[in-house]
Design a protein with these regions (language model features):
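Catalytic cores of soluble metabolic enzymes centered on carboxylation/carboxyl-transfer
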Residues: 2-131
Length: 131
């Protein structure tokens, strides 16, 4: 039962201990340079895995990506004990992800994980326009 719904107070925010960091990359069926849609048939699919790695997706080998809908084909999520480790884990996990037959934003996300501004936590919403 939710204690707050019973009228109990929440503990103060200061009592919450942060434990690690998660990163999510939204993999889309798009050209990684122009972000134009890339519909077509997936000829090969290798889903990464491992401790604290999660891939939420509906795709599979021989699946056809239609041109009519949202191009997102998966969410790749990793967790590790700190930001630098999470970035490294995401890069390695992205390199293990194989989606053949269509263009995807996988390589864009790999480049982001290697980008020194991103690694140094020095980025903003204008990142793509400066790319």
């Amino acid at each position: 039962m939710i204690k707050v719904a019973q009228g109990e107070a929440l503990p103060p925010q200061e009592s919450i201990t942060l434990k690690g960091l998660a990163i999510e990359c939204r993999i889309t069926a798009e050209d990684p340079n122009t972000f134009t849609p890339s519909p077509g048939k997936i000829t090969k699919y290798v889903c990464p895995g491992g401790r604290n790695v999660r891939m939420d997706s509906h795709i599979y080998q021989d699946y056809s990506i239609p041109p009519y809908y949202d191009s997102m084909i998966g969410k790749l999520i990793v967790w590790d004990t700190d930001r630098n480790r999470a970035i490294h884990k995401m890069k390695v996990t992205l390199e293990q992800l194989i989606i053949g037959g269509i263009k995807t934003t996988r390589d864009f996300h790999i480049a982001m994980m290697e980008n020194q501004d991103f690694i140094n936590n020095n980025y903003d919403t204008n990142y793509l326009s400066r790319r």
